[in-house]
Amino acid sequence: RKVATYLDTDHTEVTFTPEEGISHLNDVIHSLESYDTTTVRASTPMWLLCKYIKQHTSCRYIFSGEGSDEILGGYLYFHNAPNVEEFVGENMRRLRLIHQFDGLRADRCAGAHGLDLVVPFLDKEFINACMTINQNEKIDPIEKRVLREAFEGYLPHDILWRQKDGMSDAVGTNWVDTVKKYAEAEIDSKMFNEIVSKSYGYNIPLTKEEALYRSLFWRMYGRDNDHLISEIW
């Protein structure tokens, strides 16, 4: 709301309940072809948003902000990098894997509802420009400082410089807490152990939430396709 007021733009707020999100978990995992926990969590609100756009507007092209964290090392755990070499190495690894995680989420959620996605931060020229930045400038107590400085004056100062929130966290902790409780109720200890056993050591579920997503994925795509996801984030 604050950004919309600052820019004098007409924004539509779309809300959903955790229960509505849970009722669409099958649809989300079917669209994603993934069982990665972070991806499923973040995809559910985006899937519902794209559904709303399709049903209630004439928009067919949507802009989304994926890519800047991978390109500029914006994830909070990047603060733990012991040196610039480790920072850059993880930076490049995340960029190479984006098609399995955030890129997959954005593409599949939009595509599931017949929408075309435009991702400016993944434009080749932008990526190439970011790769020419002195890597030491990317390592900063404030993540993505270079990008924040570029948008000075275009966003409210406190919004521009606040700490990053993950997408599934930013829509409200109530969503994550509720889906965790749902998984606890759906997956008992016996089922959990069976799912772990049938994973045959590949991306072994560590929580009941991970086991829930894995079981839903298996129902749709079978256990032979576990390898579609190289790791669980």
PLM regions and their residue ranges:
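ATP-dependent adenylate-handling active sites, centered on carboxylate activation for C-N bond formation
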Residues: 1-155, 170-180, 195, 200-206, ...
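Conserved S-adenosyl-L-methionine
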Residues: 15, 156-165
